[in-house]
Amino acid sequence: MDLRRAERNLKILGDANSDEDMPVAHSVEETQGQALFSESDEADAEEDAAESPQSGVGGRTTTAESGGEEHREQVFLSTQVQGRIDEFEATEGARRQFRQLVTGFTYAQEDGEANAGGRTAKRVPKVRRTRRNNTKVRSLTEFNTENFERLRKEDRARSLLTMLSGKTQKVNNLLRGLQQERSRERAFHGCSVYNEGEWREIVRLLHERLPKATRSDVACIKSYVYGDGLDETPWCASHARPPDCPAQSQERQGTCGPGDDELRIFTLSQLLEDQSASEDVIPDSMDAGDAVSLGSPQPQAGLSQHSFCPDSTATSPLRPPATPLTRAPASPLPVRVYTAPASPLDYIPDSEDDPYVLQGPSQARSPPSLLEVRRTLKNIGVRPGRSAAAVRKAAAAVARIEAASDAASLGTASDADRRSALFLRMTALVRRSPRLLAHIYCLRPVALDDLRAVLEADDDFIALLDDSLIRQWADFTGICVKNDTSDSQRPPQPLESQ
């Protein structure tokens, strides 16, 4: 739009300059620029340019050729075009200044002066190679192997000092300080050492716990326990056989002679059959091979002669001991016994010969209230009616079922007994229906409504039972009960007509 206005203005100015006979009009055109560039003139110029673009171009060319250098200095531009050009230049100048400001912007220094220089690349610290630490533990197994003795001594010293002094912190600080001095590290200033009194107490306890014994005392004790002619160590000598033991008992293995001085091994069946001790074959103990015999016990060896001492106090399962083992009689102590005189009415003869069971006297008891009966019926799974007559009728039916099942009465029986009586009643009703029984034996599911209908047909009392009680009875007896009566496994006819 600005280019068109500029072209139109140039055209008008060229026409005005080419007309030399009208100086007044030329001055008017120069002084009244706003009137010449009105909206009506602009619209007319646009229409003329649209109708004859070729003529306009030819006119501009003719005007440019006819005008001279003397008229070019007097070219007048529209104030609107000049204003737009000024705004564009101001915008470009502001953008240029802003770009320079952003380019030269930096953070202020500590002294408050801004750094006018450009951005500098961030310096990356140079990676320095660390020295290899030769004291670093590379293998835990190697460390434990090399320092096993030292660690064991330190642990023993720590445990011993802790047990004697009872001060764990002091012991740990002391050992830590010694370890740091050994490794030539900096001096340890945080340990708390023992004073003179504490060291004296530790030494006294050491003498009490570890009494000093001379070598002669140790040799005397060794000769008394193991004998004078002990050539081997006590551990090896304790496993050696007695020197006077016959060698033939060691050589023969599995042979059993008829001697009376040898012990025999018997099985339980031989003992029950009362067989003699001279039997050579023991068929129940082994399938093949010779019988196993035990040598006769040797006389007791003294402690000063032998290292093996058989125990003659062991009891044998075959023969009773010669001297029965009894406890020493305890000293008699006076004991006061209180006896209460029993009345002849409280005396009950205790005899196993009585063919009947003794029963105590029955005590009179008040009948249960209506609320208790209702609560009892709800606990066992019976739905009592709202009226008192319905509750009494249901209670009488339950009592009748309990009497038929040899259970206790409603007032004295427990809820489990009453529930068991109801289970027995429903089981008896199922056994009366051969069709239902065959249906159950075939492991076919039975609808709950059909099962209720069959049971209620034989006994009206089943209508008072809850569904939960019937399901519990079905789970107890192994009957598969289903809710959906439209199942495909449901028989096409009712159970009574099958």
From Swiss-Prot:
Modification after translation, per record: Phosphorylated in response to DNA damage.
Regions of compositional bias (Polar residues) in chain numbering: 295-307
Keyword set includes Nucleus: yes
Stretches for region Disordered: 1-75, 239-260, 281-330
Example of a GO biological process term: DNA repair
InterPro entries found in the cross-reference section: Structure-sp_endonuc_su_Slx4
Bias kind Basic and acidic residues: ranges: 1-10
The keyword DNA repair belongs to this UniProt entry's keyword annotation: yes
Keywords: DNA damage, DNA recombination, DNA repair, Nucleus, Phosphoprotein
A Pfam family matched in the record: Slx4
Main location: nucleus
Biased composition (Acidic residues): 39-50
Subcellular location(s) per record: Nucleus
GO cellular component: Slx1-Slx4 complex
Assembly mode: Forms a heterodimer with SLX1.
Function: Regulatory subunit of the SLX1-SLX4 structure-specific endonuclease that resolves DNA secondary structures generated during DNA repair and recombination. Has endonuclease activity towards branched DNA substrates, introducing single-strand cuts in duplex DNA close to junctions with ss-DNA.
Family: Belongs to the SLX4 family.
Protein name per Swiss-Prot or TrEMBL: Structure-specific endonuclease subunit SLX4
Lineage, highest ranks first: Eukaryota, Fungi, Dikarya, Ascomycota, Saccharomycotina
